[in-house]
Amino acid sequence: MLPEQSAFGRSAMPGSDAVNPGPSPFAPPPNSFSGDFLGLSLPDEEHLWGMSPLSSSMPSWNGKNEQMFSNPNLERDLKHSHVRNGQPTPPPYGDNKTHTVGDLYSLSQCQFSNGAQNFQTHNDRRSFCEQSAINSNGGSSKRRKVRDAKMTQAEYNEQQQEKAKREKFLERNRLAASKCRQKKKEHTQLLESRYREQSDKKEQLVSEIARLRSEILGLKNEVLKHAQCGDEPIKLHLAQMVKKITYNDTTAPDLTDVPDAASSSEGPMTPRPQQALSFGFDDPLHLEPSRADGSTDHSVRRDSEASVLTENSYAFSTDESFDDLINV
């Protein structure tokens, strides 16, 4: 192999990254290659580098061009370049290391893995957003549930307070009603006891009235037994009783015609002072006005009383109308 060919091989293939089968953009113009280089072929290196045979119009290679293509900066740029869609691309920023052919595949795998990782990161971010939205919705629903629970608790507490107030109000009403019933029962029992007492007292009074009437009747019978004794007060009392009986018999029809006459202060009730005088025959003061009239009047009265106290008058006093004498 000629020195030009080796120099061209070094300059044409600066690194393992230039795998593009097309013409390199860093190749010299066609008129810069020598004529004796056209007949050379690189069959052993074509399968490695993927280079097509050089055209016949390429001129001969000179050392000046070799020095130009042997620039280490260009080799470094070519080593760090990437070929995409048939065009070399600049290396990643901050990459100062040289790469081999195996590094290209690892770099492509790394780029693919980075893309997959970015896609996975995007999916994770989206799932995180969805999870955040779900959590926010769940949190809002939880807050709503908590708020509803608080409202329900407040309503329950309010209902319990109202129920307690209602129970207290009903308890007071029941207590007041119980006291009222107890008081009414005690009042009823008091009235019943007073009724029994008054009934017993009434029975006692009725029995006392009956006893007194029987006693009055016995006393009047004793007075009638002494009617023939000649005692002036007894004779006067009997005469007044006879007058009252006869007066009641004569005024009975008038009283039936005029029922209000008994309730009036004037009328047949005028003889009551005489009744008082008749029961006061033991008192000599009631007889003094009659004695002041004179001896003649007194003698006439005695004669009239003697005429009244006959057997006929005594028989009249002992008939069925004698019950009226009891009430005199």
Swiss-Prot record:
Composition bias, Polar residues: 262-277
PROSITE patterns assigned: BZIP, BZIP_BASIC
Biased composition (Pro residues): 22-31
Pfam families (alphabetical): bZIP_1
Residue spans of biased composition, Basic and acidic residues class: 283-305
A cellular component term, taken from the record's GO annotations: nucleus
Gene3D superfamilies linked: 1.20.5.170
Effects seen without this gene: Increases sensitivity to osmotic and oxidative stresses, but also to cell wall-damaging agents such as Congo red or iprodione. Shows increased resistance to low caspofungin concentrations, but is more sensitive to higher caspofungin concentrations. Leads to attenuated virulence.
Regulation: induction: Expression is induced in during osmotic stress and repressed in the absence of the mitogen-activated protein kinase sakA. Expression is also highly induced at low and high caspofungin concentrations.
SMART domains, per database record: BRLZ
Keywords from the UniProt entry: DNA-binding, Nucleus, Stress response, Transcription, Transcription regulation
GO MF annotation: an example: RNA polymerase II cis-regulatory region sequence-specific DNA binding
Chain residue ranges for the region called Disordered: 1-39, 250-313
Region (Leucine-zipper): 205-219
KW Glycoprotein (keyword) present: no
Subcellular localization: Nucleus
Family the entry assigns: Belongs to the bZIP family. ATF subfamily.
UniProt-recorded name of the protein: Basic leucine zipper (bZIP) transcription factor atfB
Species, as recorded: Aspergillus fumigatus (strain ATCC MYA-4609 / CBS 101355 / FGSC A1100 / Af293)
Gene: atfB
